[in-house]
A protein has these predicted regions:
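A C-terminal junction/extension of Radical SAM enzymes
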Residues: 212-230
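Conserved beta-strand termini and adjacent loop/short-helix elements that scaffold enzyme active sites
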Residues: 6, 190-192, 227-230
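SEC14/CRAL-TRIO lipid-binding/transfer domains and related phosphoinositide-recognition modules
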Residues: 3, 7, 26, 39-40, ...
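Conserved alpha-helical substructure of the radical SAM core
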Residues: 37-68
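Conserved AdoMet/S-adenosylmethionine-binding subsite of the radical SAM
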Residues: 55-67, 76-207
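A secondary-structure boundary/capping signal
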Residues: 23, 71-72
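Short, charged low-complexity linear segments at domain edges
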Residues: 1-17
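Canonical Radical SAM [4Fe-4S] cluster-binding loop centered on the CxxxCxxC motif
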Residues: 14-49
């Protein structure tokens, strides 16, 4: 696995920070609504970026950029993710990790070694709809729960985020979802947009009225629940 994409300037991926975003190759999920279909379904060898060249570019951004975001795909599938994060961190950048939470062991290592400043974890759905929402026949929800607990208890700062898609979330069990993220401090409910790059075409957003109902319900248990993109 390798880095296959770079956004050299982002004002959106790390709140209140100017960042560079690195996109890793491949993912262990197949969420039909994923916008990064090319990376998820596997970029070719020709798409791989030389990491030394990435570091050389980042050196020219010191003082201009606050942070580097490791995104994907699923970056915890990178065998040398820790090495790459350390190399970037040594240049003085903050580190944000975007993850689906399927690798709690590596996540805990990164947190325990103080290598992460912010983590954004996708919470796909309530447990009984999790695998379906991820485009899988089975998923180990226990690993998802472990990662949720790690962020709540160990992350310097974090957010959970759920992209609302009508085909998957109009059947969501609100109570089961609430229990899944019990103890969280921050959740973003994100608007789905059917755009070029999605793995499956023709899916639909959850309208703002229904999204607001879910936000209002969860606000009774989570200090910060916000709509994003609505």
């Amino acid at each position: 696995m390798a880095i296959v994409g770079i956004d050299k300037l982002s004002l959106l991926d790390y709140e209140d920070k100017v960042s560079v975003v690195l996109f890793s190759q491949a993912c262990n999920m197949r969420c039909p609504f994923c916008h990064n279909g090319a990376a998820v379904l596997g970029a070719s060898k020709e798409d791989e970026l030389d990491f030394d060249e990435i570091l050389a570019f980042l050196k020219t951004r010191t003082g201009l950029v606050d942070a580097v975001v490791f995104s994907g795909g699923e970056p915890t599938m990178l065998e040398d993710l820790k090495v790459k994060i350390k190399a970037v961190r040594d240049l003085g950048f903050l580190i944000k990790l975007d993850t689906n939470g399927t690798n709690p062991e590596l996540l805990e290592e990164l947190l325990d070694e103080g290598l992460l400043d912010y983590v954004a974890m996708d919470i796909k759905n309530c447990p009984n709809l999790y695998a379906e929402t991820c485009g899988l026949k089975f998923i180990n929800v226990d690993n998802i729960k472990k990662s949720i607990s790690l962020l709540i208890n160990k992350a310097p700062d974090y957010e959970f985020r759920t992209t609302l898609v009508k085909e998957f979330h109009e059947r969501m069990d609100y109570d089961a979802f609430k229990e899944l993220i019990k103890g969280a401090k921050r959740l973003f409910l994100q608007k789905f947009v059917d755009r070029e790059g999605c793995i499956k075409k023709g899916l639909h957003e959850v309208d703002v009225v229904e999204a607001s109902k879910l936000r209002d319900y969860l606000s009774g248990f989570i200090p910060e629940v916000n709509l994003r993109g609505y």
